[in-house]
Amino acid sequence: MANHKSAIKRHKQSQKRAARNRAAKTRIKNVVKAVRAAVLQKDKDTAAQALTAAMSVLDKAAGKGVIHWKKAARKISRLTKAVGSVE
């Protein structure tokens, strides 16, 4: 454990940030799973709604630096393609 006051503070801050990032990544995984599940069920309306939610979550995570913006764009693109293929 750190001995200096500033190092202790930095450690606490890094733990907070890690928890926040972990929560955001979990949220991303959950919304992506929801879209994929709706696509597998071939439920176009639910898939479209889930895609909208997923796009929002991914864009927010990218904006906050949790994931890279190109990774977010790639995921959104692939999910949009999957939802578009549902008949």
Swiss-Prot record:
GO terms for molecular function: small ribosomal subunit rRNA binding; structural constituent of ribosome. Disulfide bonds: none annotated. One of its GO terms (cellular component) is small ribosomal subunit. Residues 1-26 are annotated as: Disordered. The keyword Nucleus does not apply. GO terms for biological process: translation. Pfam families: Ribosomal_S20p (PF01649). Binds directly to 16S ribosomal RNA. Belongs to the bacterial ribosomal protein bS20 family. This is Small ribosomal subunit protein bS20. It comes from Nitratidesulfovibrio vulgaris (strain DSM 19637 / Miyazaki F).
